[in-house]
Amino acid sequence: MKKILCLVVLGMICLVMLAAAPEEKMPKPQYDEKGQLLRPTDYREWMFLSAGFGMNYSPEPGSHEMFTNVFVQRWAYDEFAKSGKWPEQSMFVIDEREAASRSSINQKGHYQTDLMGLAVEVKDSSRNPDKWAYYGFAADSKSSGAMAHGNSCWACHDAHAAVEHTFVQFYPTLKTVAKQFGTYNEEREKVADAK
């Protein structure tokens, strides 16, 4: 009888400990009552994939230089590492920051300054018939509607991204993974005329 009582007490202690354990943080897309994507919070604590400088889709120089920093949720990154595929509800946040070069003790180079805006890419086939949707946030926006079907972001990613709608060819830590799983499209590295 004592043995049974000890097992019951031990079982209850385990249940209490499980209930008190902090919930694992797995950020997923959140939407408001209008169906607009809420601005992802704490995205700078996610997995950093890559940064670009001076990324411009035009052959002409832009009016300003900026950095683009790409982040994805840790759980989505881990899933990709196991399969070479992005799971549903993966979110990529492109943090767009102004570049500066004159306020540093360094004589050359650039560094990041103020946030200009965010671009967010979401894989969610329950909301998007094309699986992927694109959202743009001004520096202070709290929510954003999806860009129209067939928008220029969607079309470019569809035509040039190496894995699904993502530019894994520019994410050195994931390119090898995608190649190992056979999900990498080698042809997408040829971007001589990516219009």
Positions of predicted regions on the chain:
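Secretory pathway targeting signatures of secreted, lumenal, and periplasmic proteins
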Residues: 47-71
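N-terminal post-signal-peptidase region of extra-cytosolic proteins
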Residues: 66-81, 104-106
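Bacterial N-terminal signal peptides that target proteins for export
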Residues: 1-8
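Bacterial N-terminal signal peptides
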Residues: 8-16
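Sequence context surrounding c-type heme c attachment/ligation sites in exported
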Residues: 23-32, 39-47, 51-56, 83-195
